Amino acid sequence: MKKAILSVSNKTGIVEFAKALTQLNYELYSTGGTKRILDEANVPVRSVSDLTHFPEIMDGRVKTLHPAVHGGILADRNKPQHLNELSEQHIDLIDMVVVNLYPFQQTVANPDVTMDEAIENIDIGGPTMLRAAAKNYKHVTTIVHPADYQEVLTRLRNDSLDESYRQSLMIKVFEHTAEYDEAIVRFFKGDKETLRYGENPQQSAYFVRTSNAKHTIAGAKQLHGKQLSYNNIKDADATLALVKKFDTPAAVAVKHMNPCGVGIGDTIEQAFQHAYEADSQSIFGGIVALNRAVTPELAEQLHSIFLEVIIAPKFTDEALDILKQKKNVRLLEIDMTIDSNEEEFVSVSGGYLVQDKDNYVVPKEEMKVVTEVAPTDEQWEAMLLGWKVVPSVKSNAIILSNNKQTVGIGAGQMNRVGAAKIALERAIEINDHVALVSDGFFPMGDTVELAAQHGIKAIIQPGGSIKDQDSIDMANKHGIAMVVTGTRHFKH
């Protein structure tokens, strides 16, 4: 029977994953809070102490730092000497390590954190197990992100958990532990940057960097311009997160944390033109992110507009010469690698909230056409583009999009009809190829009726209302194609 060690601070999906492992004939070992949760869920699990024959001591500071754990993880199974030594010491092989670390970054994000609290959230045993298992990836599967649970299970069931895939998991581990260690260094070095002011001039503010990874705002290389402001940093982060969702050339413009224009194209110049045309008024004074290098031609387009920040993976020398003619525009060079961090947090009175990032993308094949009329190919393309954008828009959110750009955005309204009115009234075009995209379900048929009055012929929404049928009936009445995704994307 294969053995797995599970010890996680982020408990998302761990019960379901553990149950599936037991069904796949894994014997589970765990520690502390993870074991308690599995016990409460009636998942068969043993204590790591059963492997080490040594109790957890010092309030859990020492529990997995033991040869019985690390010998079982590190043994090279192609070396008889290693296997003989394990046998002599009565040490079992460990086949899988599932670990994520104490929430150090979240803890030190609290401005009132004490030194003792920070120190207690420095994980020792977790990184040690992760690095040991990652080093021995040829024989051991290492999982650090809950987002990988399903893929691992699928590969276990299909007997395709091969060395190449384990190597990809190994890379994630070393990226994760490197970022974790860097966050610790930055905290104790006091790596914080005082900003001119916060969201408003009467608010003081500073920027604490917990990572300088090249794919983050904190690790961006600023090539030109004034110091980033508090609002610049927030808007730039939102802009970067959205543009990274696109594989094709894409441009995103953001104002006040909401996209005002998103465009794609065969070239980055074309993509930006589509984003600009989506709302040529609101882009003024905004933040623009591009997922391709800025060329001289694109630089001329960007130079003609007042922008606060321009983000790209690269700027050519000639493009820089053009853009630097404006002394205040901030130019940020950022790696467009997808951020591996799966959690985000926000402070509230007396504490903070932590959640997984809303990165889930519903596959098209899991979406369901619920109306008599099915979407055309062009309507599908419009829906899928809008569905990538809508999680980045404050709720209640309604987007209108075609297959190359957003054409109208209604953001942050207290009711869905109000958001739809704004999007429809501000739309640069409405025709049979434009889709209406909603971040939440329709509580009744009035939004669909309003869309029909403006000529909309395709709608995509999560579904899930007790009155879904009212919206479906209204769509059928007006010959509108409607797709439901089963997943909502509220943003507050």
UniProtKB/Swiss-Prot annotation:
It holds the Pfam family AICARFT_IMPCHas. Pathway: Purine metabolism; IMP biosynthesis via de novo pathway; 5-formamido-1-(5-phospho-D-ribosyl)imidazole-4-carboxamide from 5-amino-1-(5-phospho-D-ribosyl)imidazole-4-carboxamide (10-formyl THF route): step 1/1; Purine metabolism; IMP biosynthesis via de novo pathway; IMP from 5-formamido-1-(5-phospho-D-ribosyl)imidazole-4-carboxamide: step 1/1. Its EC number is 2.1.2.3, 3.5.4.10. SUPFAM superfamilies: Cytidine deaminase-like, Methylglyoxal synthase-like. It catalyses: (6R)-10-formyltetrahydrofolate + 5-amino-1-(5-phospho-beta-D-ribosyl)imidazole-4-carboxamide = 5-formamido-1-(5-phospho-D-ribosyl)imidazole-4-carboxamide + (6S)-5,6,7,8-tetrahydrofolate; IMP + H2O = 5-formamido-1-(5-phospho-D-ribosyl)imidazole-4-carboxamide. It comes from Staphylococcus aureus (strain bovine RF122 / ET3-1). Residues 1-144 form the MGS-like domain. The keyword Hydrolase applies. This is Bifunctional purine biosynthesis protein PurH. Signal peptide: none annotated. InterPro entries: AICAR_Tfase_dup_dom_sf, Cytidine_deaminase-like, MGS-like_dom, MGS-like_dom_sf, PurH-like. GO terms for molecular function: IMP cyclohydrolase activity; phosphoribosylaminoimidazolecarboxamide formyltransferase activity. Belongs to the PurH family.
